[in-house]
């Protein structure tokens, strides 16, 4: 087999594996969230369908597939129909440039667990994952529902504001490492525990985590939906499979965000003592992913004015200060 044919086959297989694994993980994440929230609230959670309630995932899938797909008569039907697909596609495309595990050898060839190792991977991931919000905005706008439009508008303002916070935090990382490549950022942290960038950039870590909660529409910083204020926000008019596709995209973005935090700040897939790198990657990403559930259970939903004041009066000044300190450190 020629090198080009092997490369094409390898890329195709990687894409299929990533879509299959992360679509399955998105479903498992809904089960995990229900179980974790139940534990926090001293409830049992799903436990009736299958062992430990695991088959509840299949029951939920059947329910979504068989529900009536309703499109409001006064909506922008085409945009309303494709908005969930935009969310899922952008979430999966962002995974293409994220290195998941250490490279390994198969059939005498070195395999990198990444679809495309590009030298501007960080820009690619942030750009494509940021496009997911267009699905939320377009879906809410096309629904012709006041709650959906309010949710889309609130989300638009918050995303634009907090992307500045996340970008300033990432610029500090890029200044230290000197590269946009996620592989280079991972390798920069290969000298041991204290080479992890969380110790060199603790403020950037906190700022990026907060921005990530906004990007993935997670409580307590989610403005796009709120049961007490705007019902389900942008998703008020969605039902059945389209609603499910929206949430596959959302949970895939959450998983991608947890992996990205691990690569940027927590040593990536480098081995730790006698623990292999792939195990470290799974453990650290799972720990970050757990934070989504913990924050939802522990903190109340913030008001829109509180979220925006925190951004412009606290987080952006801190991000600029962190950037200046990092620049001085690099120069000196």
Swiss-Prot record:
It comes from the Bacteria. InterPro entries: NADH_UbQ_OxRdtase_su1/FPO, NADH_UbQ_OxRdtase_su1_CS. GO terms for molecular function: NADH dehydrogenase activity; oxidoreductase activity, acting on NAD(P)H, quinone or similar compound as acceptor; quinone binding. Its EC number is 7.1.1.-. The chain crosses the membrane at residues 4-24, 44-64, 78-98, 120-140, 165-185, 194-214, 255-275, 279-299, 312-332. NCBIfam families: PRK06076.1-2. It is a multi-pass membrane protein. Coiled coil: none annotated. It catalyses: a quinone + NADH + 5 H(+)(in) = a quinol + NAD(+) + 4 H(+)(out). It comes from Campylobacter jejuni subsp. jejuni serotype O:23/36 (strain 81-176). Keywords: Cell inner membrane, Cell membrane, Membrane, NAD, Quinone, Translocase, Transmembrane, Transmembrane helix, Ubiquinone. One of its GO terms (cellular component) is plasma membrane. NDH-1 is composed of 14 different subunits. Subunits NuoA, H, J, K, L, M, N constitute the membrane sector of the complex. NDH-1 shuttles electrons from NADH, via FMN and iron-sulfur (Fe-S) centers, to quinones in the respiratory chain. The immediate electron acceptor for the enzyme in this species is believed to be ubiquinone. Couples the redox reaction to proton translocation (for every two electrons transferred, four hydrogen ions are translocated across the cytoplasmic membrane), and thus conserves the redox energy in a proton gradient. This subunit may bind ubiquinone. It is found in: Cell inner membrane. GO terms for biological process: aerobic respiration. Belongs to the complex I subunit 1 family. This is NADH-quinone oxidoreductase subunit H. The gene is nuoH. The keyword NAD applies. The keyword Phosphoprotein does not apply. Its main location: membrane.
């Amino acid at each position: 087999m020629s090198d080009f044919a092997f490369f094409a086959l390898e890329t195709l297989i990687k894409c299929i594996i990533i879509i299959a694994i992360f679509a399955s993980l998105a479903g498992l994440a809904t089960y995990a969230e229900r179980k974790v929230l139940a534990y926090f609230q001293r409830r049992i959670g799903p436990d009736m369908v299958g062992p430990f309630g695991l088959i509840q995932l299949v029951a939920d899938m059947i329910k979504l597939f068989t529900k009536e797909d309703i499109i409001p008569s006064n909506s922008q039907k085409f945009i309303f129909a494709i908005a969930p697909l935009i969310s899922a596609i952008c979430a999966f495309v962002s995974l293409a440039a994220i290195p998941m595990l250490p490279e390994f050898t198969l059939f005498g060839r070195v395999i990198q667990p990444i679809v495309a190792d590009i030298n501007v991977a960080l820009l690619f991931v942030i750009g494509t994952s940021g496009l997911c919000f267009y699905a939320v905005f377009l879906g809410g706008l096309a629904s012709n529902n006041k709650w959906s439009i309010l949710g889309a508008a609130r989300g638009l303002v918050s995303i634009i504001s907090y992307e500045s916070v996340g970008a300033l935090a990432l610029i500090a990382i890029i200044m230290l490492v000197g590269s946009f490549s996620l592989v280079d950022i991972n390798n920069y942290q290969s000298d041991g525990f204290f080479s992890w960038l969380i110790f060199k950039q603790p403020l950037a870590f906190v700022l990026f985590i907060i921005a990530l909660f906004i990007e993935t529409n997670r409580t307590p910083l989610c403005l796009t939906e709120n049961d007490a204020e705007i019902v389900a926000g942008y998703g008020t008019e969605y039902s059945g499979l389209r609603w499910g596709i929206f949430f596959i995209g959302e949970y895939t973005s959450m998983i991608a965000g947890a992996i990205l935090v691990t690569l940027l700040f927590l040593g990536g897939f480098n081995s730790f003592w006698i623990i292999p790198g792939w195990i470290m990657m799974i453990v650290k990403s799972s720990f970050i992913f757990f934070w989504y559930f913990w924050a939802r259970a522990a903190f109340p939903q913030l008001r829109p004015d509180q979220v925006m004041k925190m951004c412009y009066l606290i987080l952006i000044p801190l991000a600029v200060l962190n950037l200046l300190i990092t620049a001085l450190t690099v120069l000196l």
